[in-house]
From Swiss-Prot:
GTP binds at S17, G20, K21, S22, C23, S37, T40, G67, H123, K124, D126, A154, R155. It comes from Bos taurus. Regulated by guanine nucleotide exchange factors (GEFs) including C9orf72-SMCR8 complex, which promote the exchange of bound GDP for free GTP. Regulated by GTPase activating proteins (GAPs) which increase the GTP hydrolysis activity. Inhibited by GDP dissociation inhibitors (GDIs). A lipid is attached at C211, C213 (S-geranylgeranyl cysteine). PANTHER family: DRAB11-RELATED (PTHR47979). Belongs to the small GTPase superfamily. Rab family. Its main location: membrane. Its EC number is 3.6.5.2. This is Ras-related protein Rab-39B. It is an enzyme of class 3 (hydrolase). The small GTPases Rab are key regulators of intracellular membrane trafficking, from the formation of transport vesicles to their fusion with membranes. Rabs cycle between an inactive GDP-bound form and an active GTP-bound form that is able to recruit to membranes different sets of downstream effectors directly responsible for vesicle formation, movement, tethering and fusion. RAB39B is involved in autophagy and may function in autophagosome formation.
Length: 213
């Protein structure tokens, strides 16, 4: 029987508070944008299936982390069991861009001995007239850390699918090459799930959400 999904990838979304992490994830998993969003307390959990090639689906387990300092000790615990992530900054908030280095350094400390595949995301690109960070300097920073760079807008649904799908494809290619392997005791990558019964296509493509506070 064909697996519903080939692999499960655990992803984290990190960045300063108010950069729009929760809005981006909800746009991707639920297809909606909330004008008002309460700050994440601790960690929120979402999931969605992504078809990277015809008939090849990856289940994404996405962890939305709180950006406030008082919750950082909680969110750090989720770094080690993630294989990939989106690192967000707000293009209208230069401080959030300046803090990208701090987020990356913190992640390196807590993921050992593993590594996380990151994509740098300049969020809220619909507010281009208020931009405080140029695309050029963001691309330069991303290149310095070996990351891809993409600009997104949860409000206008710009590049949201692309950000998650591109990251998923990059991880999948690393798994196929053997650069990333399934390891006992590590939740970053899991092998596919085969159900006991055949589900309809409507049942397969679902998003689910759980809040861990």
């Amino acid at each position: 029987m064909e697996a519903i999904w080939l692999y499960q990838f655990r992803l984290i979304v990190i960045g300063d508070s108010t950069v729009g992490k929760s809005c981006l994830i909800r746009r991707f998993t639920e297809g909606r944008f909330a004008q008002v969003s309460d700050p994440t307390v601790g960690v929120d959990f979402f999931s969605r299936l992504v078809e990277i090639e015809p008939g090849k689906r990856i289940k994404l387990q996405i962890w939305d982390t709180a950006g406030q300092e008082r919750f950082r000790s909680i969110t750090r615990a989720y770094y080690r069991n993630s294989v990939g992530g989106l690192l967000l900054f707000d293009i209208t908030n230069r401080r959030s861009f300046q803090n990208v280095h701090e987020w990356l350094e913190e992640t390196k400390v807590h993921v050992q001995p593993y590594q996380i595949v990151f994509v740098l995301v300049g969020h809220k690109c619909d507010l281009d007239t208020q931009r405080q960070v140029t695309r050029h300097e963001a691309e330069k920073l991303a290149a310095a850390y070996g990351m891809k760079y993409i600009e997104t807008s949860a409000r206008d649904a710009i590049n949201v699918e692309k950000a998650f799908t591109d990251l998923t494809r990059d991880i999948y290619e690393l798994v196929k090459r053997g650069d990333i392997t399934i390891q006992e005791g590590w939740e970053g990558v899991k092998s596919g799930f085969v159900p006991n019964v055949v589900h309809s296509s409507e049942e397969v493509v679902k998003s689910e959400r759980r809040c861990l506070c």
